[in-house]
From Swiss-Prot:
Record-linked InterPro entries: Alpha_tubulin, Tub_FtsZ_C, Tubulin, Tubulin/FtsZ-like_C, Tubulin/FtsZ_2-layer-sand-dom, Tubulin/FtsZ_GTPase_sf, Tubulin_C, Tubulin_CS
UniProt main location, coarse: cytoplasm
Protein name: Tubulin alpha-2 chain
Binding site for Mg(2+): 71
Keywords, comma-separated and alphabetical: Acetylation, Cytoplasm, Cytoskeleton, GTP-binding, Hydrolase, Magnesium, Metal-binding, Microtubule, Nucleotide-binding
Location of this chain's protein in the cell: Cytoplasm, Cytoskeleton
Cofactor: Mg(2+)
Amino acid sequence: MRECISIHIGQAGIQVGNACWELYCLEHGIQPDGQMPSDKTVGGGDDAFNTFFSETGAGKHVPRAVFVDLEPTVIDEVRTGAYRQLFHPEQLISGKEDAANNFARGHYTIGKEIVDLCLDRIRKLADNCTGLQGFLVFNAVGGGTGSGLGSLLLERLSVDYGKKSKLGFTVYPSPQVSTSVVEPYNSVLSTHSLLEHTDVAVLLDNEAIYDICRRSLDIERPTYTNLNRLVSQVISSLTASLRFDGALNVDVTEFQTNLVPYPRIHFMLSSYAPVISAEKAYHEQLSVAEITNSAFEPSSMMAKCDPRHGKYMACCLMYRGDVVPKDVNAAVASIKTKRTIQFVDWCPTGFKCGINYQPPTVVPGGDLAKVQRAVCMISNSTSVAEVFSRIDHKFDLMYAKRAFIHWYVGEGMEEGEFSEAREDLAALEKDYEEVGAESAEGDEGEDDEY
């Protein structure tokens, strides 16, 4: 078996995690108490869903997941929520005082008290696996726990499980909407370690997802629940091929191989289609070509950056539902002819496709319509650099005045760590610029842009 362990860190990680596990359970027909009526073999570890769930002797299915937060309120919602019986109490780890939006607290003072306990729980889950494939890490880099404890855990995982792949689903600060003043600091410090310790990171950004909910689902005032349900569809589509049998299955290491041209260039954009409300879906025929085109629309991207400003290096299309390879090939061929979708010239093929016959599931009472087929796109585009340059700019404005720095230094950080992290990100922006320009002397003098 190729098992995956999910690690949910901080408020964002946990709430996205809740949405994901709710969806997984619905997809597999697992009840909130962990029973699965359709599974006839008790304790049989050979079903595809065992990559994400372990099975007890009593026939209960337990998620291979750990939830960690430095303060209890968010985890208490899991402990009292609809799926409280699904998780083993030891999988829910909470501390007493939170990181107070401070990377240094999450990474040094308070985080280090809880990190050994987390690793211990993760070790128990890993011992339960016959062939651990890797980790899915969910966090946000704007707060204190997601950024600080998140990086600390990633660093320790690299030491303990060197070769296992780590896929990050990371919520980045939005251009306009901000949840804390020191977001730029936390993000830069955290990205510095994400660069080294994750193999693929999928960037998500609340503002972009708000806009998708508003525009495509006609939700006037989207809540985090609306956002997370949309994100969970993306993550479910990515992991569907690990959990179901399909025609073209994709495994976690395959993402890495196909999407990451250079180790540092591993920050991905994601999009999902069709995002459509039930009222509209009734009147629309969503063909493979249509959903593929809409997945490439700049407005479908789940991070605020415009892929038209950069070039694609690679792109992974995960279809699910009623899709045959012939339609996929036709859709991809038509994408390649579009002038607006540009690939770097050193990557001529650029597409990796997966097909899974399990149609997308929707959460009852959710916002998305039940559709026959859907596609999730994960792409590596040089336009991601916009996300970093935006954060770097905000970081520079604050750091020039050394604003708020004393909170970090007071928790045992050194000022040098700030400049080191900032230089690392400057190098990353430079890397992206070079990758986009690294072409042979191209036609139409495209090199003049830089």
